[in-house]
Protein backbone atom coordinates (compact mmCIF):
# COMPACT_ATOMS: atom_id res chain seq x y z
CA UNK A 1 0.00 0.00 0.00
CA UNK A 2 1.30 3.43 -0.92
CA UNK A 3 1.36 6.18 1.67
CA UNK A 4 1.07 9.62 0.11
CA UNK A 5 1.85 11.81 3.07
CA UNK A 6 5.38 13.25 3.09
CA UNK A 7 5.42 15.55 6.06
CA UNK A 8 8.83 17.04 5.50
CA UNK A 9 9.50 16.28 9.18
CA UNK A 10 12.55 14.11 9.79
CA UNK A 11 14.74 12.15 7.42
CA UNK A 12 12.95 8.78 7.30
CA UNK A 13 9.52 8.55 5.69
CA UNK A 14 7.60 5.33 5.12
CA UNK A 15 6.31 5.57 1.57
CA UNK A 16 4.83 2.11 1.07
CA UNK A 17 4.44 -1.29 2.67
CA UNK A 18 3.08 -4.73 1.93
CA UNK A 19 3.02 -8.04 3.79
CA UNK A 20 6.75 -8.65 3.25
CA UNK A 21 8.42 -5.24 2.94
CA UNK A 22 8.51 -1.57 3.86
CA UNK A 23 9.73 1.21 1.56
CA UNK A 24 11.52 4.10 3.25
CA UNK A 25 12.97 6.96 1.21
CA UNK A 26 12.58 4.90 -1.99
CA UNK A 27 14.56 1.94 -0.55
CA UNK A 28 12.80 -1.40 -0.13
CA UNK A 29 13.49 -3.20 3.18
CA UNK A 30 12.54 -6.85 3.65
CA UNK A 31 13.66 -7.42 7.24
CA UNK A 32 12.61 -6.15 10.64
CA UNK A 33 13.73 -2.63 11.51
CA UNK A 34 13.56 0.28 13.90
CA UNK A 35 12.68 3.63 12.36
CA UNK A 36 12.28 7.09 13.82
CA UNK A 37 12.10 10.43 12.03
CA UNK A 38 15.89 10.83 12.32
CA UNK A 39 17.35 7.33 12.75
CA UNK A 40 16.89 4.07 10.84
CA UNK A 41 18.21 0.79 12.22
CA UNK A 42 17.76 -1.87 9.52
CA UNK A 43 18.23 -5.56 10.29
CA UNK A 44 16.58 -5.47 13.73
CA UNK A 45 17.06 -8.96 15.19
CA UNK A 46 13.54 -10.29 15.83
CA UNK A 47 12.06 -11.97 12.76
CA UNK A 48 8.76 -12.73 14.50
CA UNK A 49 6.99 -11.84 17.73
CA UNK A 50 8.15 -15.19 19.12
CA UNK A 51 11.78 -14.09 18.54
CA UNK A 52 11.25 -10.78 20.34
CA UNK A 53 13.03 -10.38 23.69
CA UNK A 54 12.94 -7.47 26.11
CA UNK A 55 16.60 -6.66 25.37
CA UNK A 56 15.77 -6.04 21.70
CA UNK A 57 14.25 -2.74 22.86
CA UNK A 58 17.62 -1.47 24.15
CA UNK A 59 18.25 0.39 20.88
CA UNK A 60 14.72 1.83 21.01
CA UNK A 61 15.39 3.24 24.49
CA UNK A 62 18.50 5.03 23.24
CA UNK A 63 16.23 7.09 20.95
CA UNK A 64 14.26 8.43 23.95
CA UNK A 65 10.77 8.13 22.42
CA UNK A 66 7.52 9.23 24.00
CA UNK A 67 5.66 6.52 22.03
CA UNK A 68 6.81 3.20 20.57
CA UNK A 69 4.73 1.64 17.82
CA UNK A 70 5.32 -2.10 17.66
CA UNK A 71 4.38 -3.72 14.36
CA UNK A 72 3.88 -7.40 15.17
CA UNK A 73 4.04 -8.72 11.61
CA UNK A 74 1.34 -9.56 9.09
CA UNK A 75 -1.22 -10.07 11.85
CA UNK A 76 -1.72 -8.33 15.16
CA UNK A 77 -0.59 -10.53 18.02
CA UNK A 78 -0.69 -9.08 21.52
CA UNK A 79 2.89 -9.25 22.87
CA UNK A 80 3.43 -10.73 26.33
CA UNK A 81 4.10 -8.04 28.93
CA UNK A 82 7.53 -9.46 29.85
CA UNK A 83 8.74 -8.71 26.32
CA UNK A 84 7.86 -5.04 26.84
CA UNK A 85 9.33 -4.64 30.35
CA UNK A 86 12.22 -2.33 29.38
CA UNK A 87 9.76 0.13 27.88
CA UNK A 88 7.17 -0.24 30.63
CA UNK A 89 9.76 0.40 33.35
CA UNK A 90 10.68 3.70 31.66
CA UNK A 91 6.98 4.61 31.35
CA UNK A 92 7.17 4.75 27.58
CA UNK A 93 3.81 4.37 25.88
CA UNK A 94 3.58 1.28 23.66
CA UNK A 95 1.06 0.75 20.88
CA UNK A 96 1.01 -2.73 19.32
CA UNK A 97 -0.63 -3.46 15.97
CA UNK A 98 0.03 -5.33 12.75
CA UNK A 99 2.99 -3.94 10.79
CA UNK A 100 0.81 -2.32 8.10
CA UNK A 101 -1.15 -0.39 10.71
CA UNK A 102 2.14 0.52 12.42
CA UNK A 103 3.42 2.04 9.16
CA UNK A 104 0.26 4.14 8.77
CA UNK A 105 0.36 5.24 12.41
CA UNK A 106 4.05 6.18 12.19
CA UNK A 107 3.32 8.38 9.18
CA UNK A 108 0.40 10.08 10.94
CA UNK A 109 2.31 10.70 14.18
CA UNK A 110 5.44 12.15 12.58
CA UNK A 111 3.21 14.60 10.72
CA UNK A 112 2.15 15.80 14.19
CA UNK A 113 5.79 16.23 15.21
CA UNK A 114 5.57 13.50 17.86
CA UNK A 115 8.73 11.87 19.23
CA UNK A 116 8.02 8.33 18.09
CA UNK A 117 9.86 5.16 17.18
CA UNK A 118 8.41 2.31 15.14
CA UNK A 119 9.77 -1.17 15.79
CA UNK A 120 8.57 -3.14 12.77
CA UNK A 121 8.66 -6.91 12.56
CA UNK A 122 8.72 -8.12 8.97
CA UNK A 123 8.35 -11.88 8.79
CA UNK A 124 8.75 -13.32 5.31
CA UNK A 125 8.33 -16.92 6.45
CA UNK A 126 4.61 -17.04 7.17
Model-derived regions, located:
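Short active-site-adjacent helix-start/loop capping segments
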Residues: 42-43, 76-79, 105
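Non-catalytic interface/targeting segments
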Residues: 1-52, 58, 63, 111-126
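Mid-chain, well-packed structural core segment of small domains
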Residues: 60-96
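Conserved phosphate-binding catalytic cores of ATP/NTP-utilizing and phosphoryl-transfer enzymes
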Residues: 105-111
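Short acidic loop-to-helix transition motifs that present clustered carboxylates
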Residues: 99-104
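General beta-strand structural signal in soluble alpha/beta enzymes
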Residues: 95-98, 118
